[in-house]
UniProtKB/Swiss-Prot annotation:
Methylamine dehydrogenase carries out the oxidation of methylamine. Electrons are passed from methylamine dehydrogenase to amicyanin. Pathway: One-carbon metabolism; methylamine degradation; formaldehyde from methylamine: step 1/1. It holds the Pfam family Me-amine-dh_L. It catalyses: 2 oxidized [amicyanin] + methylamine + H2O = 2 reduced [amicyanin] + formaldehyde + NH4(+) + 2 H(+). It comes from Methylobacillus flagellatus (strain ATCC 51484 / DSM 6875 / VKM B-1610 / KT). Keywords: Disulfide bond, Electron transport, Oxidoreductase, Periplasm, Signal, Transport, TTQ. Its EC number is 1.4.9.1. The keyword GTP-binding does not apply. One of its GO terms (biological process) is amine metabolic process. The modification Tryptophylquinone is found at residue 112. The gene is mauA. This is Methylamine dehydrogenase light chain.
Length: 186
């Protein structure tokens, strides 16, 4: 048998000292906690509001940010002021209205919010977009406006999520979106 070198004997002493002071179960428990904690770290919420002015969202949809000029005359148009951050079919074109779902659909209990400028009175209003669920997608008046949209890690400000979860009677199928005013934002 070869004689241990200084490095080997140092590691052996450290291992024996650690083994005499800690039990195997304690070590395995701490190791397991560390591994689980490391795996769950990316799931923690991230708030990046301080860097919002650096965000450059991709311009997509019917109207780009540069060309978006809200109007207050035609609620069935994608540039109607209440639709500044809508992503989906307007219920106005599907048998409903700005604030009510078409017959045969149910209002989702969840919503996403945006603040939209009304050119008619010069005020900014808080809009709580809510999906109407329970029928197949309407497919008329599809608008994809991204003004004020934030990434999915801020879901209450993201319009890419189908908000039909939580609807009664398992009505999880998206049909259209309503745009009720919650109050003044300014």
């Amino acid at each position: 048998m070869k004689k241990n070198t200084g490095f080997d004997s140092g590691i052996e002493k450290l291992a024996r000292k650690t083994a005499s002071k800690t039990g195997r179960r304690s070590f395995i428990g701490k190791l397991g906690g560390f591994l689980v904690g490391s795996a769950l770290l990316p799931l923690l919420p991230v708030d990046r509001r301080g860097r919002m002015n650096e965000a450059h969202a991709e311009t997509k949809g019917v109207l780009g940010r540069e060309g978006y000029k809200p109007q207050d005359k035609d609620p069935k148009s994608c540039d109607y002021w209440r639709h500044c951050s809508i992503d989906g079919n307007l219920c106005d074109c599907c048998g409903g209205s700005l604030t009510s779902c078409p017959p045969g659909t149910e209002l989702s209990p969840s919503s996403w919010v945006a603040s939209c400028f009304n050119p008619g009175d010069g005020q900014t209003y808080l809009i709580a977009y809510r999906d109407c669920c329970g029928k197949q997608t309407c497919g008329r008046c599809n608008c994809v406006n991204v003004q004020g949209e934030l990434p999915v890690y801020r879901p209450e400000f993201n319009n890419d999520i189908v908000w039909c979860f939580g609807a009664d009677n398992d009505a999880m199928t998206y049909h259209c979106t309503v745009s009720p005013i919650v109050g003044k934002a300014s």
